[in-house]
């Protein structure tokens, strides 16, 4: 984790405060520490850091700027460390900020590594976009997972001209999101738009049929 922190702050320019805030978010979970015996010493680390050593990123929170910054840094670091090896993102998230999610999405598409996505509970709203954006053939869900797509939410107060600007932007975002889901799932944009008019919940088999995932994982055979 120390190597990642050095990379994130020195080479990517990620604010150290953002890393600390993300650590506090993670510590709000029951986050056990791992004692790992090595050849010369014994190392203690939180379980999320240990997972990252195996190229596993866990997104188990609402998507906000702090979370997105760290996940983008993790993706870039792992791509730099070994460009030919897959990265896995486990998703259990209700979604969150579209703009923060865009940062994660674009980074997933930018890096050279294949990115496997695995839904382990719920991938809703922006998290469903990240799920479907995984590398084709490497998008998975556990049997009782739920996937939900819907139109973006927004609201603001201000002058009439400001409201018009905000309305145009949310319509542009809606079109972008539907296009992304369509391009990765194979569903026509018109179908995605119709289904997303209200919360559209899918079971794992329904998500498979829709093209959001490629396979339902029953058992880890490793």
From Swiss-Prot:
GO terms for molecular function: ATP-dependent peptidase activity; ATPase binding; serine-type endopeptidase activity. Its main location: cytoplasm. The active site is at residues 125, 150. Keywords: Cytoplasm, Hydrolase, Protease, Serine protease. It is found in: Cytoplasm. CDD domains: S14_ClpP_2. Pfam families: CLP_protease. The keyword Cytoplasm applies. GO terms for biological process: protein quality control for misfolded or incompletely synthesized proteins. It comes from the Bacteria. One of its GO terms (cellular component) is endopeptidase Clp complex. It catalyses: Hydrolysis of proteins to small peptides in the presence of ATP and magnesium. alpha-casein is the usual test substrate. In the absence of ATP, only oligopeptides shorter than five residues are hydrolyzed (such as succinyl-Leu-Tyr-|-NHMec, and Leu-Tyr-Leu-|-Tyr-Trp, in which cleavage of the -Tyr-|-Leu- and -Tyr-|-Trp bonds also occurs). Its EC number is 3.4.21.92. NCBIfam families: PRK00277.1 (NF001368), PRK12553.1 (NF009205), PRK14514.1 (NF011091). Cleaves peptides in various proteins in a process that requires ATP hydrolysis. Has a chymotrypsin-like activity. Plays a major role in the degradation of misfolded proteins. Belongs to the peptidase S14 family. Fourteen ClpP subunits assemble into 2 heptameric rings which stack back to back to give a disk-like structure with a central cavity, resembling the structure of eukaryotic proteasomes. This is ATP-dependent Clp protease proteolytic subunit. It comes from Porphyromonas gingivalis (strain ATCC BAA-308 / W83). The gene is clpP.
């Amino acid at each position: 984790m120390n190597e990642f922190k050095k990379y994130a702050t020195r080479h990517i320019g990620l604010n150290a405060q953002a890393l600390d805030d993300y650590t506090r978010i993670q510590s709000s979970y029951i986050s056990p520490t791992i004692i790992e015996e090595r050849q010369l010493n014994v190392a203690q680390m939180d379980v999320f850091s240990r997972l990252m050593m195996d190229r596993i990123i866990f997104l188990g929170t609402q998507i906000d700027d702090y979370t997105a910054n760290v996940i983008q840094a993790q993706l870039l670091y792992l791509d730099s460390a070994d460009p030919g090896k897959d990265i896995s993102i486990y998703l259990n998230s209700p979604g969150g900020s579209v703009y923060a999610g865009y940062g994660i999405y674009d980074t997933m598409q930018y890096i050279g590594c294949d990115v496997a996505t695995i839904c382990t509970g719920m991938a809703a709203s922006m998290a469903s976009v990240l799920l479907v954006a995984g590398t084709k053939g490497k998008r998975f869900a556990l049997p009782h997972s739920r996937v939900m797509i819907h139109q973006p939410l927004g609201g603001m107060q201000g002058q009439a001209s400001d409201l018009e600007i905000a309305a145009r932007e949310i319509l542009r975002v809606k079109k972008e999101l539907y296009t992304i889901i369509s391009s990765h799932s194979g569903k026509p944009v018109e179908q995605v738009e119709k289904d997303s008019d209200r919360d559209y919940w899918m079971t794992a088999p329904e998500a498979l049929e829709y093209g959001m995932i490629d396979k339902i994982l029953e058992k880890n055979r490793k």
